[in-house]
Amino acid sequence: MIGCIKTRLRRFLGDETGSAVLPFALWTPLIVGIALSTIEVGALTIRTTQLERSLDETVRTIRLNTDVAYTHEQLKTMICEGTSLLVGCEDTLRLEMVSLDMRDWVDPASRPDCVDTTFQQVTPQRAFSQGIAHEMMLLRACYMYTAFSPASYLANALPSDDQGYTAIIATAAFVHEPSSGGF
């Protein structure tokens, strides 16, 4: 009886059929996770680059058109028109423009003003001032987006709110040039 069990056990341990299934089962989740994270990094890079570029172009327009006092909605529209891949840009982009006093420095708020995705209709505007000639201004844009693949390792590592939105923040500082009309 014991000899029969030993023989069967030896035969089972010596059999190599199906041995490729184990490495496949162990490595596949890792490789798929890395592939999804690579796609997520690419999508994040494209979104960040588009937001930064559009914000820079908008700041350039503000600096060159010194006689115009742009509103929050006008600047948001200008930024969103300068991007093509920021899905729902008008709804999930929030701008914050504050003046910076170089002689009596006070740090701007460490947390950017972002859209509250739980109550999109009731998000108050925290800080948006036009500024005057020769004044240093900080313009911060916060775009909220959902991850391309929530199952990727990167999407799990990025900070997100309760609805699964992650923030991309772009910042630009500029000085209002003197204008003939002033604002």
Predicted regions and their residues:
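Short, conserved structural patches
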Residues: 3, 56-183
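Alpha-helical assembly-interface signal, strongest on the long, hydrophobic N-terminal helix that forms
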Residues: 1-83
